[in-house]
């Protein structure tokens, strides 16, 4: 499952669980985006924070794992590079790429789109009432699903934190605590940065 996960919320987790059940998946690998090419001018939380929040959120489900491949690759993240690397790591696996239906609608603009269909089956998930369309996409390469919990959005969660409103029950408890501890989404610099080991680096502070 690819995504910015800024922050990860219960909608992501329910969507992953529903897709896993429908397609009898053995494992769901969450792949936090390193540097999204579509959001190159948008302020997002540092990759280490997004990675750690994803680890925290998925820890209790033995079917869920988290991969750093997009974060560690460097440069802009393209789905084709993600899938090529996953294919190299798991050559015998049948890959399903889970993404938001809104992102899937833009897939024809993605890098090396013709190769994508040979690497994975794409599953577009959306909230009820959102128009789903697979126009222009190969019928045997794409599935669409509605997931009620996707009425939660990362954008709304960030806005609530910025306004001092609670995000309990919208995101997992451990993620709430991580956001609070590191003061994410309360300032342009998103609080404190983390190094590759998950250790805090002060940003604009004399001490902590």
UniProtKB/Swiss-Prot annotation:
Keywords: ATP-binding, NAD, Nucleotide-binding, Nucleotidyltransferase, Pyridine nucleotide biosynthesis, Transferase. Pathway: Cofactor biosynthesis; NAD(+) biosynthesis; deamido-NAD(+) from nicotinate D-ribonucleotide: step 1/1. One of its GO terms (biological process) is NAD biosynthetic process. GO terms for molecular function: ATP binding; nicotinate-nucleotide adenylyltransferase activity. It catalyses: nicotinate beta-D-ribonucleotide + ATP + H(+) = deamido-NAD(+) + diphosphate. Its EC number is 2.7.7.18. Transmembrane segments: none annotated. InterPro entries: Cyt_trans-like, NadD/NMNAT, Rossmann-like_a/b/a_fold. The keyword Nucleotide-binding applies. It comes from the Bacteria. Catalyzes the reversible adenylation of nicotinate mononucleotide (NaMN) to nicotinic acid adenine dinucleotide (NaAD). NCBIfam families: cyt_tran_rel, nicotinate (nicotinamide) nucleotide adenylyltransferase, PRK00071.1-3. Belongs to the NadD family. This is Probable nicotinate-nucleotide adenylyltransferase. It comes from Kineococcus radiotolerans (strain ATCC BAA-149 / DSM 14245 / SRS30216).
């Amino acid at each position: 499952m690819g995504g910015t996960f800024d922050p990860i919320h219960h909608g992501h987790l329910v969507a992953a669980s529903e897709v896993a059940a429908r397609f009898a998946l053995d494992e769901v690998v969450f792949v936090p985006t390193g540097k999204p090419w579509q959001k190159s001018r948008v302020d997002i939380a540092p990759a280490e924070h997004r990675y750690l929040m994803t680890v925290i959120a998925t820890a209790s489900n033995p079917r869920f794992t988290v991969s750093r491949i997009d974060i560690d690759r460097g440069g802009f993240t393209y789905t084709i590079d993600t899938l090529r690397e996953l294919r190299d790591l798991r050559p015998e696996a049948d890959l399903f790429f889970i993404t938001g239906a809104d992102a899937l609608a833009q897939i024809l603009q993605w890098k090396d789109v013709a190769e994508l269909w040979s690497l994975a089956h794409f599953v577009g998930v959306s909230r009820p009432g959102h128009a789903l369309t697979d126009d222009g996409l190969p019928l045997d390469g794409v599935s669409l699903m509605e997931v009620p919990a996707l009425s939660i959005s990362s954008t709304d969660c960030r806005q609530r934190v910025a306004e001092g409103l609670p995000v309990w029950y919208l995101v997992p408890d451990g993620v709430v605590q991580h956001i609070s501890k590191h003061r994410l989404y309360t300032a342009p610099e998103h609080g404190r940065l983390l190094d590759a080991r998950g250790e805090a680096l002060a940003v604009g502070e004399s001490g902590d």
